Amino acid sequence: MAHYFVGDVQGCFAELKRLLAEVDFNPSRDELWAVGDLVARGPDSLATLRYFQSLGDAGKTVLGNHDLHLLALHGKLKRDKPSDNLAPLLNAPDIASLIDWLRLQPLMRELPEHKVIMTHAGVPPQWSLDVLRQESQLVSQALKQSDYLEALISQMYSDTAERWDPSAIGLNRLRFCINALTRMRYLYVDGHLDFDCKQPPEDCNNPQLRPWFEFTSALRQSHTLVFGHWAALMGKVNDPKLKALDTGCCWGEYLTLWHLEKDQKITQKKLKKG
């Protein structure tokens, strides 16, 4: 059995299939773990979502910011942008089934026997594993409710929930978890989230900002953290316990697959149209 972790697919289904064929992925024996953002911008979000749904227990994904945005679009809470390439998905006959499957996906997954944790954007350095489990579970519980659109999705967009407050309750607590696990790149030196800078560290000109993974974290010392979201990193982080897998396939770069047991990365260049 092999565990394969894939970066932000974002509708780049042809590239995903190429990678899986190259490693002879077999869902009857192997598992495919995705760091989230299965949809948006790429040419075939519909096929991507259908494929992961079809994998059953052999497919494991977490929610990314684009996945959450899809929930908002389907709920008519946001307007679809042509650049997101989501019209075929939103108009698909099985969209309700796909949405119901997607909203049941968590914000974090772990592989305890390998001490691997996967989230979309990273893990706040202030959090222990117990806190990570607890906070992500609170969001999952909210997404499972029949009123999830009104109670959570319609109100999740907020740049004000940028500081971790263990005494926070209700929506503000959920907002911080969503912001941290699906949007985080940089933190200010005092530990609160920045939502603006997307450049790689060498190009960030704000001395008050540091990548989230440069802060001291007990969890990062004990576990391997697998994440995506930050395409500008192009997978380059100077720490063997960090696996940055977003390498910008939907922007014309690469889709990256990491084979856990071999600690090996395999890449597929964005395919040309036609």
Model-derived features with residue positions:
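N-terminal active-site segment of His-dependent metallophosphoesterases
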Residues: M1-L55
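Hydrophobic N-terminal alpha-helices or hydrophobic patches in metabolic proteins across all domains
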Residues: A2-F5, R18-A21, G42, L55, ...
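Active-site neighborhood of phospho(di)ester-bond hydrolases with catalytic His/Asp-centered motifs
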Residues: V6-G7, W33-G36, T61-G64, T119, ...
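Active-site environment of divalent metal-dependent phosphoester hydrolases
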Residues: C12-A14, A40-G42, H66-L73, Q126, ...
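A general structural motif
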Residues: P27-D30, G56-A58, M118, S222
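Short, basic, glycine/proline-bearing loop/turn elements
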Residues: E31-G36, K81-L90, L193-P201
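Active-site neighborhood of divalent metal-dependent phosphoester bond hydrolases
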Residues: L46-L49, S54-G170
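Acidic, His/Gly-rich catalytic cores of divalent-metal-dependent hydrolytic chemistry
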Residues: R133-G274
